């Protein structure tokens, strides 16, 4: 027999043997058909989704402030058809148009964008499981990588700290594009890459990695580029002409954010290791598994690992050069490739150990990725009352309390100037919250003042990007301001010598410790 060797050997591979080079016909992945799922498989799928719904709901209190920005966009879109914070006032600060659209679409039948987030997150995790199992059979002819990778994604503290944002959606589409690339399915890959770019503009970097590494003829690459362009064109044309920019205004806001001082994305990991040592180490728990003898693997595995390593490195280099702040969700672009490479490394060792005394024990290692989250739950209690890793000034529960106070005590026509985080308070108060994220006239001013002299060659690109930019009407003039005040020894309450003060509430997170957040009259 001249076919390739069995992928499930009963003894370790012989020295020098490449493992595995190709898939035998018996285990090659079949493309899905439209036939109905057998009842047992359907029952398992329903049980998995139900379990995921319960699991995801347990993290309801951990949604960070930036997640509520996307919820605010989705709710406004549902209620008024406006792309922005408030009806009749367009804005362009939602970093993930696809995530906002999905939340709005699912929120419509559920009558709640919050319930939509829980359902979408559960579906994204279920989709990840299906794709990871497919990737596992593609590379190894068995399911271990799929289950190991799924546990790694579903229990990673950093990923769980971004629920409500686009991170899990991004991971899902990233793996979808990778699987299509490995299976040589170019049109679905191009669609996946297009959706990935709509989930975050960074998705274009994966396209830049995949095309040079592909061995397909130039004609197939050109066709894939056309499909990719057709997928992203409707949104980007709308964004360019109607919103005045191909990319969200947050690019200008974040690049110009001076709140982080000298700390940037390049040295952000050191910051999180210092401020969140256990949580950061738990997120990176599987990193040592990325080191394994890749030269003993077949071409398909080598190509997969090359794609993952190249993408993570390219993204890190670009974000470091831009000098953007080290927001924790930016590191998802290194985390996703790391988790996938680690899952491949773990599966490599499990398959090599088949037929040895330790083989059965290694299969139980599928639960190892959950150790970090379990350690955090043991140390801090579960469910968590804030995201394991976050940079907020108050928990979502505290911000919601402040927003509810505003709803009860401020007139609907009154606006509040926000100096700080806006998402949760805006969502909970149903009042006009004014800053650069909600008021497009602020972003107009920042764009006019922005200097890109340190980025050679970007000037003409920016001129083209803002070709359709027009001035936008401001939100109503603020009658109040929402500002942080230094922590003190006294109980929450307005200082007796400050007649403008209307309310002071405590904010406390692992990031800032304790601080007071106040609402003051501006008139």
Predicted regions: what they are:
Residues 1-9:
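N-terminal acidic, proline/glycine-rich, low-complexity intrinsically disordered segments
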Residues 10-14:
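Intrinsically disordered, low-complexity proline-rich regions
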Residues 15, 19, 23-523:
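Membrane-proximal envelope and lipid/glycan-remodeling enzymes
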